[in-house]
């Protein structure tokens, strides 16, 4: 392996812009080596076709305890020792556990949820309207972007309505770019403790929700332990939540930067699905999703990767691949899509389980927000938006708006 490899993760170029290194590597060295926090080396894959190969190759493993698996931080290395959930499993265990919760997230199930999603969005916008902005701008993240996905996933899990606000606060602490590691860790534990109590309750008194299903269909027959049910619930709760909060805020900021496309969406809210599709390509809010280790020697692009070497495939870089997307650095909700998929939700068997739910939520948000508040504006200069730190996933910490 090469010495003198650049340190990874890269920092973003500026607020919403992906790291400049990705474009350079796609052009000159699309499969190259990078140095991780502990001095170890891994292969970084930056082009769309190679990222898709990494996501689907059976010669690569998702199991974090395997030799060479690339962890990006000390806390990641620690987390890898915990009992895994399906996102960190290979076949056949992966599909076996994933199928326990998959029925909740099918297109059909999400369609049945649509009235609840719409009601949640409407209620939160109505609350914002009642508060008004006569006393100054309102933080769209706190009042809207955070509670929308939080309330929906909590309700699916079976959290009583009275606890939604408290749990949403805990979730905000663990995902907010400005919280300390200790605060985030304490909030994590609060959520795990809460879910453990809920699992105990649902074992005795099941209802119609994900945790009850796990208890009735999996824990009671002895297929999984109670601790597994808690970890699966926690995964579903946290995996996409910060990403969704960020995508809502990034969507509003992006429309403010593209007034012509905002005018289009206001005039025709049925364009929301294509806006969401482009949003998820342009701002790949979880930049480092696809990590593997080689089970055997394998060619990736033009490089030979040896057994037990780590691989990081950047779906964020793949979504800006010039060979796949025309003018990839332009935000264009009217773009003509190539046959290849954008990779905002990953690719292959490990593709995000809640993709249909996430798109339904985002589509509902952007088809409703500007109908309810046609005069909604970002209340700070666009160059002064408070983006997450440049070494974290792209997002917005708070977004003052007036309407």
Curated annotation (Swiss-Prot):
Membrane-spanning ranges: none
Effect of residue 64 to E: Impairs interaction with NADH
Result, substituting residue 75 to A: Decreases the NADPH-dependent activity
UniProt cross-references to CDD domains, sorted A to Z: CYP105-like
Keyword field contains Membrane: no
Catalytic activity annotation: nitrous oxide + NADP(+) + H2O = 2 nitric oxide + NADPH + H(+); nitrous oxide + NAD(+) + H2O = 2 nitric oxide + NADH + H(+)
Reported cofactor(s): heme
Effect noted on mutating residue 393 to V/L: Impairs catalytic activity
Gene3D superfamilies (UniProt xref): Cytochrome P450
Alphabetical UniProt keywords: Acetylation, Heme, Iron, Metal-binding, Monooxygenase, NAD, NADP, Oxidoreductase
Region Disordered: start-end pairs: 1-21
SUPFAM superfamilies: Cytochrome P450
Induction (record text): By nitrate/nitrite.
Phenotype for residue 76 to A: Decreases the NADPH-dependent activity
Protein name in the entry: NADP nitrous oxide-forming nitric oxide reductase
Gene that encodes the chain: CYP55A1
